[in-house]
């Protein structure tokens, strides 16, 4: 399910009056996070904050929290509260891996892809971009520009979110279960 953004922000102790940009690159915290952590806070509008999820990458977490952070940045290590962070966010910068993209898609969270691994992730990029659900940029400067462009044009984010909500069902497990039960009923009689 999806928690209302204001409630998610309250639960996570994030400012209620700020839009959340979520930055994550999988459980290992890879990708251009350091460059983005330095550049993006300088460019974000005043009504936005950057939440960086480092995952299991303790070295990255320590390097990002070694010095005082700007007021518009939060750095999180490993967390079991990813669904809440996604519910609080307006945009996620993430690798186009299967789990992250599926969870974001089901939640209707627009995606900006970074640091793709050739193969499966390339297909994910093609699929989501061709369906109007995501975008991609190469390099930290281009990513920062894209984030600011999207935040300045909420209608683009809303359109991506609506497309995701229309195209992706959060109840896939229920549909599969119902199909199996129906098929079993046909083959074996009423269960």
Where do the model's predicted regions map?
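Conserved donor-nucleotide binding/catalytic region of nucleotide-linked donor-dependent transferases
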Residues: 2-6, 135, 140-141, 148-166, ...
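A donor-sugar binding/catalytic signature common to diverse glycosyltransferases
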Residues: 82-123
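Donor-nucleotide binding loops and adjacent catalytic segments primarily
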Residues: 3-88
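Hydrophobic, well-ordered secondary-structure elements that form the walls
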Residues: 75, 93, 104, 128, ...
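Short, amphipathic alpha-helical "lid/cap" segments that border enzyme active or binding sites
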Residues: 140-144, 170-181
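Hydrophobic/aromatic beta-strand patches that form the interior of the parallel beta-sheet core
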Residues: 51, 74-76, 91-93, 112, ...
């Amino acid at each position: 399910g999806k928690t209302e953004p204001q409630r998610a922000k309250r639960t996570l102790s994030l400012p209620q009056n700020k839009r959340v940009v979520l930055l994550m690159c999988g459980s290992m915290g890879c990708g251009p996070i350091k460059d983005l952590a330095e550049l993006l806070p300088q460019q974000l509008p005043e009504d936005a904050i950057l939440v960086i999820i480092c995952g299991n990458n303790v070295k990255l977490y320590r390097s990002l929290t070694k010095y005082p952070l700007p007021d518009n940045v939060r750095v999180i290590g490993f967390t079991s509260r990813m669904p809440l962070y996604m519910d609080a966010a307006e945009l996620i910068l993430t690798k186009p891996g299967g789990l992250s993209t599926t969870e974001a898609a089901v939640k209707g969270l627009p995606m900006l892809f970074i640091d793709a691994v050739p193969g499966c992730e390339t297909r994910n990029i093609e699929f989501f971009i061709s369906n109007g659900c995501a975008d991609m940029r190469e390099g930290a400067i281009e990513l920062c520009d894209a984030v600011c462009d999207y935040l300045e044009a909420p209608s683009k984010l809303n359109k991506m979110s609506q497309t995701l909500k229309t195209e992706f069902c959060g109840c896939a497990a229920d549909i599969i279960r119902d199909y199996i039960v129906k098929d079993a009923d046909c083959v074996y009689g009423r269960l």
